[in-house]
Each structure stands twice: as structure tokens, then as C-alpha cells.
Amino acid sequence: MLLRARQSTEQCSRTVGKKIRLVFKFIIKRLGISALVMLTASVILFILTINAGDPLGDLRESTSPNRQNLIDRRIAVMHLNDPWYTRYFAWLGGTSKCFVGACDFGTNFRGQRVNDLLVDAMGSSLRLVFLSTVFAIVLGVFFGVMTAIRQYSGFDYVVTFISFAFFSLPSFVFAVLLKEYGAIKFNDWLEDPTISFATTVLFAAIFALFAQSLVGGSLRRRAYAGAGAFLFALVALVVISSTKWFLSPQLGWGFIIVVSIASAVLFASLFCGLSNRRALACTLGSSALSFLVFLAASGSLWQPTWGLLFVLLLAVILAGAVIGFVFGGYAKRSVVWANVWTACATFLAVFANYMAEYWADYTELVGDRPVATVGAGTPNFQGGEIFWLNVIDTVTHLLLPTISLTLISFASYTRYTRSSMLEVLGQDYIRTARSKGLPERTVITRHAFRNAMIPITTIVATDFANLIGGAVITESIFGWQGMGALFRSGLDAVDPMPVMAFFTVTGTAAIVMNMVADILYAYIDP
């Protein structure tokens, strides 16, 4: 008996060792092929860049008396008298130092270190694109799943139409429209933020139509949902208009309580179902604990640091996870996730509450035109010493470009998720799960959703790789100096160093994220 157990253990160890060797072999093979592709592409891009124009064109047209000295200096800085392959290998030698953590991407035509320019550009692009990518993934996957479940319904047709509209609309057109109506017109409206009764009824009706289509079910159920949503939106808009809420928005701890409880019920229903009373009690307990933690720290939250906010968020997440693990019962894993998302929702409500407290002060500092159209921050901002004013300034500058990038990417995620989900829902094992009497929520969330996410993994990995590349058109329209601006400036000046730095970072990110996607396939695929 012991001999058989030992043989079984040895066989298991050999199997695990073989799998590990195969994984390492796969990674090394992929890295070798990727390095060869990067090397070939870098040669082609370098040649194309240096032949894209005349790097001395602006100086040749200059009327400066020291024009020749400027030309000679640029020739020396850019090594224009050297053959292209000498310049290329000089760049390659500096870039190869990245393997020992000492990257040297050279200097641009002005003599500035490209390393410094690259760090600033990456930080700007990550701020601009990260949130939009996360929002696009979350919203796109959610609406993709919902449209697949409600195939050929009114909700499906509306979301499909909106998705194709955003996908077809050129990004520069959408960005310009956002600047005109989301910033300029909105800032003008803030001078007297009242909403006419006709507009109130129109927006309430649109919200009611959306709510009833999202609820689904029988006509009676959708009618009740639509009527309730209409009344809620109507009352909310009337109150907002009559109190001129946008001039000095107030949320308060009552708002935080409502959001916390609502998120607890929502995530409990999504992950466990409301029939699991134990899970619901755990999420409500996590909600209450999160609220008490933030209430206890409220004195420090008027002038916090990012470190304090991170510690508080981590604390409520860990507390929720412990509650779910200890008291979650047979569905403890699902309860843990429900508690984690509930804690995050409560944190966001607290964050929004403190931003609202400082909104009136911020609008006064920026001349009553809070929504920005250009740049990453207000020049010579007077409220820089106050944490929440800095946060509001960053958010108002991120708002429009984030919306622009989110809605364009949202269309792709919605369509891909819908088609993948429909394919999975037609599989035999889904019919088997339904025939066994499993609830539809369990069939969707535990059996169909995970498999439907396998093709989406590649798109998500590619999008995160594109984070570093930024969004050239969006950056240009909204005046952000990110990776796109770095690439464009190098190309305009026929300067290969910024262009090659852009290529190196984005190419490496693409290789790494595609490899991560391949590894995630093995984890997600059951």
C-alpha cells in the first residue's frame, strides 16, 4: 500500500515537472521569436523614420544670423554625417542596456535625454488611458452579457445600435463634440443650472425605457420597473434643478449608507443569489463594517494622502474577505468576492462625497468653468496645497478624454462579448446544466461566463499593451503630452530616437501582454 502511494506521488511529481519544463520551453521559444520580430521591425522603422523628411528643413528656412552654427550643431547632435547603420547600432547598443536596467535611448534633436521625455510621456498616457480601458472592459463585458441573455429584445437592439454608432464615429469627431457640448456648453449652463420641465420629462422617459429594458421579464414587470424609474428620475431632476445642485453638490453620509447597502444587495444577488440569506447577511455586514471604518477615519479624510486612502481601502477589502471566508458557508468564495466589491463601492462613495464637498471652492478657483478642454491640469492652479482640490482638478481634466476613449472601446467589448456569450450558451453542457434544474443565474455566472471570457482575454491583453502607446488623436485634441505626442514630435522632426523609444516600449508591452494572455487561457479554460 505504501509502495503504491509512493509510486503515485513520484508519478505526480514527474508529471508536474514535465508541465513546468513545457511551460519554460514555450516561454523561451516565444521570447526568441518575439525578439527576432522586434529586431527586424526596429530596422525597418528606423530606416523609414530617417527617410521621412529633412531633419534640417526648419533650419534651412531660418533667417537667423547663426543659422549655419545651428545646422552644424544639429548635425553633430543627431549624427547626420554617419551612415544609417552606424546610427542604428548606436541606438541598439543603448537600448540593449535595458537588460541590465540601464536603458539609454539617446537624445532628441534638441539635445534632451529621451529617457526623461519617455518617463513623463508614459505617466501622462497611463493617467489618460488606464481608467478609460478599465471602464470600457467593465461596461462592455456587462452589456455584452446582458444583450446575449436578452437576444433580439428591445434592449439588445438599442445597445447594438449605440455600439455601432460609437464604433463608426471617428474619434476626432466625437472628441470635438465632447469639447463643445460636454465642456463649453455645460460650463455656460452652470451660470444658471436649471432644467426645463420638458427636458426633465424627456430624460426621465429615456431613463425609464432603459430601466424597463434592463429588467426584462413580463410586460407587467417591465411596466412597473419603467414607472418606478420614471418617477425616480423625474423627482431627482426636479430637486437638482430647483436647488441648483450642480453649483454646490452635497452628498453626505446618508448617500454613502444608501450606496453601501445597495451595492451589498446587488453583489450578493449577482454572486450568490438573494435566496442565500447567509451570503446576503455577510455582504451587509461587510457594508456596515466598511462604513464604520470610513466614519471613524472621517477626521483624517479632509486632508488625506494617497497612502492613507490605500491603507483604508486595503483594510476594508481584507475585512470583507475575512468575513466572507469565515461566515460564507458553502459559497464562501462567492461571498468573499461580493464583500470585496461591496467594500470598493463604499470606498468610491466616500471618495465622491469628499470631492463634492470641495466642488464649489474648485469652480470658484477656475472661474466657474470647471470642465476642462485642454491639458492635464490647470496652469498656475491656486489650490494645489489642498488634496481634494488637486483631485478634482485632475478628474475634470481627465473627464472628457476618458469618456471619448471609453465609449469607442466599449463598442468592441460589447460586440465581442455578446457573440462569445451566445456561442457558449448554445453548447451542450449549458443545456445539460439547465436540464438539471440549476437556476439561470448559476448557469450564466458559473458555467457560461467563464468560458465566454476566453476569447475576450486576448482583446483585454492587447488593450492593456496599448495603454503605454496612448491615444495619438485624443492626446492631440485634448492637448495631452503623452506617448502619442512623443511619437508625433519625433516623426515631425525626422528624429528617430523618440520614435524608436516609443516603438521599444509599446512593442515590449505587446509581447509581454500577449504572453500573459496565453497563460491566462490555461487558467480560465476549465
Annotate each PLM feature:
Residues M38-T86, I195, Y358-L389:
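Hydrophobic alpha-helical transmembrane segments of membrane transport/permease proteins
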Residues N66-C98, F478-S489:
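Short hydrophobic, aromatic-rich alpha-helical segments embedded in or entering the lipid bilayer
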Residues F24-G32, N115-R127, V159-F166, I392, ...:
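Alpha-helical membrane-interface segments at transmembrane helix boundaries
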Residues I28, G32, L36, T40, ...:
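Hydrophobic alpha-helical transmembrane segments of multipass integral membrane proteins
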Residues L131, V138-V145, A204-P496, V505-Y523:
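Alpha-helical transmembrane segments of integral membrane proteins
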Residues R30, I47, N51-D58, V141-M146, ...:
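Membrane-spanning helices that line or support transport/gating and their immediate boundary helices
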Residues V16-V23, H79-V141:
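An internal, D/E-rich "acidic patch" concept
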